[in-house]
Every structure is written in structure tokens, then in C-alpha cells.
């Protein structure tokens, strides 16, 4: 029975080797898929978020009407200044702000000015958003 056990050992080795080869390629494939996914993932939350944000929007789509009203309204014969309606950020602006916020929690003045200009927002709006 000696040759038999020897060939059994050899077959086992070949099987183990094959198995390792398979798990190796599967492992590297999984790692590759994972790295691609994690690389793309910073943007996924934004798309989902902006999508949800857009769905919530429609009820409040009359900022134009509010802005068209005069800044000062007469109340009991006294002029009363009307506060500007709350800014509604577009989903694109929100996504860009969030992306920037993930990189740096605090913006220096020039960075803030640049970001505000690129998004068509005021620096104050950007500052408040970052708070």
C-alpha cells in the first residue's frame, strides 16, 4: 500500500495548488473590484442625496415670486424691511459643497471666494453652509 499513499499525497498537493491559484485570482479580482468601487464611491452619496433633495424641492418652487416683491413693505404706515427668503441651493451646488467639505472642513477666505464664485453663490452662503 506504500505507492498508493504516495500518489494520494501527490494528488492532494495538486488539488491544494489548484485551489490556491483559484483563490489567488478571485482574491485579486475582489480587491480590484473593491478598489474601483471605493474609488467611485465618494460621488455616489451625492447623487443619491441630490436626487432626494430634488424630490423634496417642488413644493417650494416660488422663490421668484418672493424676490419680485418689494424689499420694504408698509406695515401700519411704518416701512418694514422684509428678510430675504432662505436660499435654496441647487443639487449641483450641494454636491459640490459636500465634496469640498469632505476634503477640507475649513475654507480659507480665498478658497471660499473661489468656491462661491464657481457655484454662483455668495461667500456668506458658502460660509454659512460650512458652519
Swiss-Prot record:
GO MF term set: DNA-binding transcription factor activity, RNA polymerase II-specific; RNA polymerase II cis-regulatory region sequence-specific DNA binding
Residues within the DNA-binding region(s): 82-131
InterPro entries: Distal-less_Homeobox_TF, Distal-less_N, HD, Homeodomain-like_sf, HTH_motif
Gene3D superfamilies the UniProt entry points to: Homeodomain-like
Membrane-spanning segments: none
Entry's family note: Belongs to the distal-less homeobox family.
Role this protein plays: During development, may be important for neurocranium morphogenesis.
Protein's name in the database: Homeobox protein DLX-4
Organism per entry: Eleutherodactylus coqui (Puerto Rican coqui)
Gene: DLX4
Amino acid at each position: 500500500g506504500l505507492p498508493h499513499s504516495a500518489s494520494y499525497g501527490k494528488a492532494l498537493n495538486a488539488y491544494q495548488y489548484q485551489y490556491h491559484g483559484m483563490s489567488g485570482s478571485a482574491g485579486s479580482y475582489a480587491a480590484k473590484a473593491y478598489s474601483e468601487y471605493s474609488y467611485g464611491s465618494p460621488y455616489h452619496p451625492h447623487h443619491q442625496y441630490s436626487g432626494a433633495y430634488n424630490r423634496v424641492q417642488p413644493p417650494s418652487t416660488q422663490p421668484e415670486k418672493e424676490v419680485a416683491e418689494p424689499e420694504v413693505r408698509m406695515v401700519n404706515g411704518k416701512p418694514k424691511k422684509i428678510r430675504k427668503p432662505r436660499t435654496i441651493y441647487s443639487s449641483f451646488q450641494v454636491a459640490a459643497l459636500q465634496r469640498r467639505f469632505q476634503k477640507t472642513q475649513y475654507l480659507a477666505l480665498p478658497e471660499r471666494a473661489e468656491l462661491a464664485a464657481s457655484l454662483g453663490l455668495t461667500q456668506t452662503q458658502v460660509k454659512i453652509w460650512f458652519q
